[in-house]
Structure formats: C-alpha cells, structure tokens
Amino acid sequence: MEIRQIVYPGEKIDLEGQKPRNGLYEENDEYYSEYFGVVQKSDKFIDIVPFNGPYMPRINDKVIGKVIDVSATMWTVDINSPYFSLMHMNDTPWHVTSGDLRKYLNVGDYIYAKVSILNEIKESWLSLKDVNLRKLEEGSIIYIKAPKVPRVIGKAGNMINMIKSETNTKIIVGQNGLIWIDGEPENVDLAINAIGMVEKEAHTFGLTDRVKAYLDKMKGGNNGRSEVNQ
C-alpha cells in the first residue's frame, strides 16, 4: 500500500508546474502547506488535504444540513460547522408564507442546499434554488471528516460513481462531510462500509481499485453489517 506524501504546516511544496489551489499559502514567491495532511495532485492543480479539521463553508458549496430551529420566516440549519446557517423562506422553491414554515421543513429534517451568502463573521445563508437541491426524504445520513470529502468523491467523481454503481444506491455527498444514501438496506450497508474504507485509507494510492475489489468480494459472499455510525 503506497502512502501519499505527508506534509506539515509551513513545509515548502514543489508545484512541479501545477497550480496551487486549497491548503497552500504564498511567501516570497514560494508555496507552503497550511496543514498537517497529504499532497493531492490532479491534472492541473495541487491541494493539501488536512487529516482533520472542521468544515468551513465557502460560497457555492453544496452541503447537507439538519434543521434545528424554525422561526416565522427562516430555518436554522446545522451544517457540521462551528457556525450554524440560516435559510430564508424566499430561498426555497416553495410558495411559503410567514408562519407556516413547518409545513415544508420541520426540526429534524435534512436538506441538500447551497451556500449562497457568507459574511465576514462566517455566518452563512443557504438556498434550495438550484438544480437537484431539495429536502432529503428517506435514506440514511452518515458523517465523515470534511477534509476526506474530495477523496470520497474522487477525480471527476470516479470514486463515488463507482460506489453508487457497484452498490446500486443513490448517494449525495455534501462538501461538509454529511452523506445521504438510499437503496435496499443491504446495499446501503455495503456503500457505507466502502465509504468508511475510503475515509480510513484516504492517504494511500490505488484506493479506487482496492475499494472496487472489496465490493466485488462482498457482493460475491455474505455482506457484513455497517461499521460506520449512521
């Protein structure tokens, strides 16, 4: 099992012709790592993926959140961040009137939403006005560490698309580390275990092939129950 390059905060990063993106800072025309994590390279970009850390919202991030409060005109949503988010009734596809918000979303409901506004004190506002954004019905919600989300999605979506195809499940990955999975119970369990494997081994090479081999093996025998908390 080959390990990706591990770097420490302040460690100089050789870009090798690629463009810096996330987790790097510039000083005197050189680039350095912001985090203790691993180097992740794509065709054009280089990122530092931290091993740990809270989710910090960014404009246009698509996240999964849980409604924790309902007022006359807006919902308060937990998006797995140090700061709660708000969503105004006008930022939904429904014709909502003040005072009847619980007819549409109540405490405990989950949504797949977009971060539409982010202010200087990290307050964020969500919107459901975009393609595929909606209230999440049925299914299971699991949690992974937010820094591992890019690895679960994979390059051009190859990892998560493979897991969906091999397990015959519907999966939505929020950039905040919450994941919605729907399908037959045994298939959902298999998808959860595969995602847990990706999270655990995110710092290694050849992971897509190993996860595929694991799924092939499990589908050929008796599936085990999930080892990841739902």
UniProtKB/Swiss-Prot annotation:
Any one GO molecular function term: poly(A) binding
Key word RNA-binding present: yes
GO BP of this protein: CUT catabolic process; exonucleolytic trimming to generate mature 3'-end of 5.8S rRNA from tricistronic rRNA transcript (SSU-rRNA, 5.8S rRNA, LSU-rRNA); poly(A)-dependent snoRNA 3'-end processing; RNA catabolic process; U4 snRNA 3'-end processing
Localisation: Cytoplasm
Task of the protein: Non-catalytic component of the exosome, which is a complex involved in RNA degradation. Increases the RNA binding and the efficiency of RNA degradation. Confers strong poly(A) specificity to the exosome.
Protein name, UniProt field: Exosome complex component Rrp4
Assigned GO CC terms: cytoplasm; exosome (RNase complex)
Domain KH residue range list: 137-195
Gene3D superfamilies (UniProt xref): 2.40.50.100, K Homology domain, type 1, Nucleic acid-binding proteins
NCBIfam families: PRK04163.1-1
Transmembrane segments: none
Keywords: Cytoplasm, Exosome, RNA-binding
The organism's taxonomic lineage, starting at the top: Archaea, Methanobacteriati, Thermoplasmatota, Thermoplasmata, Thermoplasmatales
Annotated Pfam families: KH_1 (PF00013), RRP40_S1 (PF21262)
Species: Picrophilus torridus (strain ATCC 700027 / DSM 9790 / JCM 10055 / NBRC 100828 / KAW 2/3)
Keyword Cytoplasm: yes
Subunit annotation: Component of the archaeal exosome complex. Forms a trimer of Rrp4 and/or Csl4 subunits. The trimer associates with a hexameric ring-like arrangement composed of 3 Rrp41-Rrp42 heterodimers.
Domain S1 motif intervals: 60-129
SMART domains (alphabetical): KH
Source organism, top-level taxon: Archaea
Gene: rrp4
Similarity-based family: Belongs to the RRP4 family.
